[in-house]
């Protein structure tokens, strides 16, 4: 199966549109295009049990973000104050940029 391109990039502010974290907003920390998943700051928190090591002699339970499917998030437009769909715009010099489909501002 060919790898599909994601509609979000690292550093984008996104809103979760479905699931247990619906309505939460956060920044994309990392993308996994082959799995169609993204890691969003403060969303889908999971408890990871860590073994005691020399760096962390105590060990214990660490709370961290888990990946969510990319189709469950939408890019957040700061001007519209809403999650929006994105479009592409090519300027005179041939540079491609992403724009908000509602208000037309560059994201």
Curated annotation (Swiss-Prot):
GO terms for molecular function: rRNA binding; structural constituent of ribosome. Keywords: Ribonucleoprotein, Ribosomal protein, RNA-binding, rRNA-binding. One of two assembly initiator proteins, it binds directly to the 5'-end of the 23S rRNA, where it nucleates assembly of the 50S subunit. One of the proteins that surrounds the polypeptide exit tunnel on the outside of the subunit. Part of the 50S ribosomal subunit. Gene3D superfamilies: 2.30.30.30. Belongs to the universal ribosomal protein uL24 family. One of its GO terms (cellular component) is ribonucleoprotein complex. This is Large ribosomal subunit protein uL24. The keyword Membrane does not apply. It comes from the Bacteria. GO terms for biological process: translation. It comes from Natranaerobius thermophilus (strain ATCC BAA-1301 / DSM 18059 / JW/NM-WN-LF). SUPFAM superfamilies: Translation proteins SH3-like domain. InterPro entries: KOW, Rib_uL2_dom2, Ribosomal_uL24, Ribosomal_uL24_CS, Ribosomal_uL24_KOW, Translation_prot_SH3-like_sf. NCBIfam families: rplX_bact (TIGR01079). SMART domains: KOW. CDD domains: KOW_RPL26 (cd06089).
